[in-house]
Structure formats: C-alpha cells, structure tokens
Amino acid sequence: MPNSSSNVIDGRAIANQIHSETAKRVEYLKSKGVIPGLVFIRVGEDPASVVYVGMKEKMSAQLGISSKTFVLPEKTPQSELLELINRLNNDPSVHGILVQAPLPDHISQEVVYSSVSPRKDVDGFHPLNVGKLLLGDKSGFKPCTPAGIQELLIRSGVNTEGADVVILGRGEIVGKPMAAILCQKAKGANSTVTICHSRTRNIEDHCRRADILIAAMGVPKFVKAHMVKPGAVVVDVGVNRVPDPTAKSGSRIVGDVDFENVQPIAGKITPNPGGVGPMTIAMLMQNTVRAAELATGIAL
C-alpha cells in the first residue's frame, strides 16, 4: 500500500517540462520573425471563466506567446460573436482562437465552435478536428484536457497498452475525446476503454476492474475507496465548487475523487488541484505554437 505522497502524480512539474519544450519552439519562431498569437473570447462575467482566462493569459506571457482577450457583454447577440470570430479567422497574426465556455444560453456552443477556423481551433472542438481524432488522423488538434491526460500518463510511466480504462463521464470536452484518444493504435493508447455515465448499470463494478480510472463526471468525491482496484491509476478531472464556511470565499474546489481515502489504495493518483489542470493549459500552449508552425511552415 503506497504511503505519503510517493504515488501522487505532480501535474505541475510535468506541465513545466512541456512549457520548457514549448518555449524553445516559440524562441525559434521568433528568430524567424513569427510571434505566435492567441486570442481569448469571453462572453459575460462567469467567475470561473475570468479565472481560467487569466491563468491562460499569464502562461502565454511567460512563454512569449502574444495574447489578447475580447470580453463581450452577457447579452451580446450570437451574430456579433460570429462576426468577431470571422475577423480573427482572417487575421494572419492570430494563430489560435479560444472561445471560453460556458456561453450564455442564447448562444449556440456548437455553432460557435464550428465557426472557428479548424487551423486556429487550438481547443480541438471544431467538427473537422473531432472527426480527425476519431479517424486517427494526427494532422488535427486534440482537445487540451484529454491530450493533457494522455501526456500525463506517458510521462508518469503508466503503461496504457492493453490496459482496462474506465472513463466516468461521456461529455464532449473530456469523456468522448478521451475514449477516442486511448483507443488509437499509438503510444500512450492501445487501451480497452469503457465509458460510464449516469445511466450505467453497476457502475461501481466497472470502476473496480479498471487499471486506469478517469473521473470526469462533475460529481464531488464520487469515486470512493471501495470502487478502486488496489494499484489502479486514478485520474481526477472534476472541478466542483462546494460550500466551505472556513474558506474566505465560502466555498472550495474539490474533484470527483475522494482523494484522502483513495490515495492509499491507488498505484498512482492525480491531486486536485495540481494534477490535470496544469496539463490542460500546457497542451493549449503547445497547440497554439503548433498552429503558428503550421500556418507559417516554420518549425524547430
């Protein structure tokens, strides 16, 4: 049984490795007169979105990526947002466009994601990039969180080949693309994948046979110790705000995994925060630099 924090995967440390690699690519592009450009679009003042965009802006600056944020009022018409995206699609100084979710109810997320040029879709949500992912076509952009989880597993020495992977959650951002990535005939994949969701029967039984358990349901501390096979790798993707009278804000963020009780049983486990989150940003930066390389034909 693991003790202390010896089995905890340090997502921040691995993300920093990737940032170092990305920074070298940025330096090379700049030496050739190309500055990678990333634009964030935020509609409304969702508190979490403000924080997330701020973190991405900060990392862009640290890596030498030029970033700009457009903040639109909550009641902005969809047509106005699409006009902005079209302008950015045609701006050669912009290599990546990220529309921060969630969007207001009157704006169709599907329409917005489809309007971003696939060549600038650094989030990996355009239908063309989703299709490429399913086909195993590596020319597209992978969604940042699933791609970050795969990289986390690879760099942590987790063998995914032939592994029974259980993914909790069937969402478009994590669950479905994660399954597609791990099914590929590729490094860090070749897994046998099961997706569980709210209608899954005997979900605990599925969890208990997982060699790798990826929790992305959005249910606080859903994964309990009795649901985890001893020695399994547990990845916690959940971001859930729960009341906490002891916190200044009156709430705190917890994951989908009961970390304190699962950690002693797991072979490896990601903390939350400090696990998947930093990897998501690392992959966004990597996608942006790759978009700049593809747009200019310049690469290290």
Feature map (PLM): residue ranges:
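Positively charged, low-complexity intrinsically disordered leader regions
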Residues: 2-34
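Active-site cofactor/substrate anionic-group-binding motifs, chiefly glycine-
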Residues: 49-93
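N-terminal small/polar loop signature for handling phosphorylated ligands or for N-terminal nucleophile
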Residues: 74-96, 106, 196-222
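Anion-binding alpha/beta catalytic cores of soluble intermediary-metabolism enzymes, centered on
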Residues: 96-165, 206
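Rossmann-fold NAD(P)-binding glycine/threonine-rich loop
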Residues: 109-131, 237-299
